[in-house]
A protein has these predicted regions:
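A short, flexible beta-alpha/helix-coil linker loop
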Residues: 29-33, 143-146, 171
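C-terminal substrate-binding/active-site "lid" region of AdoMet-derived donor-dependent transferases
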Residues: 155-222
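The AdoMet/dcAdoMet-binding core of the Class I SAM-like
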Residues: 4-6, 18, 24, 39-167, ...
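SAM/dcSAM-binding transferase cores
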Residues: 1-17, 31-40, 46-49, 57, ...
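An acidic intrinsically disordered interaction segment
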Residues: 9-22, 169-176
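A generic structural signal for alpha->beta connector loops
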Residues: 12, 86-88, 112-114, 168, ...
Length: 264
């Protein structure tokens, strides 16, 4: 997924299909998003599934009252899923070609009372004072069109992301664990949120590492987390039991809410 203002031409969008899956590309063979044509609500890519792990930390009964912000549209998998949950959803994507392609090829609806798509720089969005505390869930996937490195990756940006979250909010970020920039990105997220508030999945086969960063989240008891994981897996067909196994060792020792950080 791609968004951020730079003094370069925005890449063209290309589409490919294979074995019932439609893929989004930006001038390169790198996959920027995917959709199963006969089941658009199915989240096809493993790392994108993991970006929904925030579901473990909210009761299903409040999903429809949850405010989601997505930085980087990709093929709209997260957007479609959040809309299906009834969530108020805001998407920020710099490249209007990506937005147009998603509406033509990836079942992205036009703006409605529940969906707002903004064609703008994600750095500007998180810096707007009026946005503070406006998101319960924040999904960040901001790699460039060559999937080389995040286009927004400063500590100031991640502090802006934290400011965007309401108390109890969760940010999920896609990084490449095999990339030389990973340790730097992880350190900046930890500096912005606090080390104890940051949790990592293991890399996917493709090398994607999803990072969870939390703002004053009180972890449910292990039995409650297990119940939620079972419900997510049964109802929405996401591998939440696996998420819990991957995250549990780090989550259990730190159940207390985190202290707030001073503003950047």
């Amino acid at each position: 997924m791609s968004t951020a203002r730079r003094q370069v031409d925005l890449p063209e969008v290309t589409i490919s299909e294979s074995r019932g899956i439609r893929y989004l590309h930006l001038d390169t063979p790198w996959i920027q998003g995917a959709m199963r044509i006969d089941d658009p609500l199915d989240i096809e890519l493993e790392y994108v599934q993991r970006m929904m792990a925030w579901m473990l930390f909210r009761e299903p009964a409040v999903f429809a009252d949850t405010r989601a912000v997505q930085l980087g549209l990709g093929a709209g998998a997260i957007t479609r899923f959040c809309l299906a949950l009834g969530m108020q959803t805001t998407v920020v994507e710099l490249n209007p070609r990506v937005v147009a392609a998603c509406r033509t090829w990836f079942r992205l609806p036009s703006d409605t009372p529940g969906l707002e798509v903004l064609t703008m720089d994600a750095a500007d969005f998180v810096a707007e004072p009026r946005r503070r505390g406006s998101a319960d869930v924040l999904s960040v996937d901001l790699y460039d069109h060559e999937a080389a490195s995040p286009v927004l990756d400063s500590q100031a940006f991640y502090r802006g992301c934290r400011d965007l979250l309401a108390d109890g909010g969760v940010m999920t970020v896609n990084l490449f664990g095999r990339d030389a920039s990973f340790d730097r990105s992880h350190a900046r997220i930890a500096a912005a949120f606090g080390e104890a508030a940051v949790h990592l999945f293991k890399p996917t086969r493709e090398g994607n590492v999803v990072v969870l960063a939390m703002k004053q989240v009180t972890f449910p008891e292990p039995d409650e987390l297990a119940r939620r994981a079972e419900n997510i897996q049964t109802r929405w067909k996401l591998p939440a039991r696996k998420w819990l196994r991957m995250l549990r060792l780090k989550l259990e020792p730190d159940p207390a809410p985190l202290p707030d950080l001073p503003p950047a």
